Amino acid sequence: MRQTADRLRRWRPGAIAVVILCAGLGFVAYEKFLARDISIYPDDEQNFKYGSIGNDGATGVPYAIWIVLPKVFPEYLPGPGGYASLGFRWEPGRTQSDAPLGFSRARVGVERMAINCAFCHVTTFRRALGAQLEFAAAGPGNTVDVLGYQNFLTACARDSRFSGDGLLPAMEQEVHLSWLDRLIYRYAIIPFLKKSLLRQAEQFKWTGQHERPPWGPGRIDPFNPVKFGMLRLADDGTIGNSDMLAVWNLGARDEVRADAPLHWDGLNTSVREVVLSSALGDGMTAQEYDKQTQASLRRVATFLRRTKPPASPYRPDPAAVNRGHVLYVKLCAQCHAVTGARTLTVIPVEEVQTDRHRIDMWTPAARDAYNHYRTGYDWNFSHFQKVEGYVARTLDGLWLLAPYLHNGSVPTLADLLEAPQGRPKAFVRGGEVLDSSRGGFVAPPCDPAHPEKGAFCFDTTLPGNANFGHVYGTDLTAADKADLLAYLLTL
């Protein structure tokens, strides 16, 4: 017994040391990999622009790495200017060291940069060339190149310089790293992120298959990634490329048609489900769907119900506006006015005759899979639906919704009033200078075979990019078109 007691006394200090060491390592592991701290914004608009949607741990890129990627790998960007070349924008008072619009900067172990709803839903515009940049929250993101960002991260991860030796010198010029930080980044975070980005690249291989055209700035295929990823449906070759949505003023729907779809795609009628499913599509996980994330998403929903589009800056000739209003009532109001009999209803694609690829992308199987999606949590989805057309939406904020049609295939309102054969066949997307005479953004013609470096040439002859259909008003006289355009510019 005495020998046993002696052995215990001799082992006790060592055992205590082991326990302390394990506890210390556990604490470090928790602090550097798991500890979560997200910023709380008192203002709902700031929360929409910069708040977390619960995807920081799953898809967020550590800030210390994210901030140096454009410096280490500039050749993988479409042009100079770092992330700005991908259409990212910073509000006044912020620098490129801060989070751009549409990114949360939250801590999950380390600080991470992750996209949020504003990544696709803030419009940036200038009233004239050289004028101050202005922002419209909840409008369609007209400059951001979502697939370009994904491809940039992929190209970086495939480069042999995506390593401790390749990244740490640049990182130490931007942020303070302790000796422990350097070890953790070198042997854990950088290798793990590289594998994660390469795995994500495999999940997006479908974007370059089946003759799918590139998205370009201000466009996205929002639901095929969900179909083939989260819902685990097979690649069916469909194309869902479409213009970014305006998501402002969702509460006004209740005044028009309470059970109507929320957007022109007709997919869902519930604000809660649209916000929640969007967060899931952007990488939110059940593990991060905690009270803070739930509160943030409720605030996003409230903001989208209440926020209004900015008033049109255009002041056309009042007489022309009055004449144009008469034409609008005759030709457009039935489907687009608040009091219209068909406003917020599904217009069959056979009638509107626009490109149907987006309709075919959303299959009954996808609808059913989303309504029954329960991975990790009972999300309680029940309002996803399949429609055979596009919803005729109200025209609030019309002056900022260019390019027009659901796939962004018509650059200006003036072009939309032309017969399809007279509309531009190819034009530059991603502009933010307003075209005050034609309605929309300045969008010069381009040659898809010889695009200008740094500019995205949108080719309407590619699958999913067609600019035909919606021929209402195209048979008016030139004078009547000018009057109708004058009225539309005020909306």
Predicted regions and their residues:
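Short, Lys/Arg-rich, polar N-terminal cytosolic tail immediately upstream
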Residues: 1-4
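Periplasmic c-type cytochrome electron-transfer domains
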Residues: 6-491
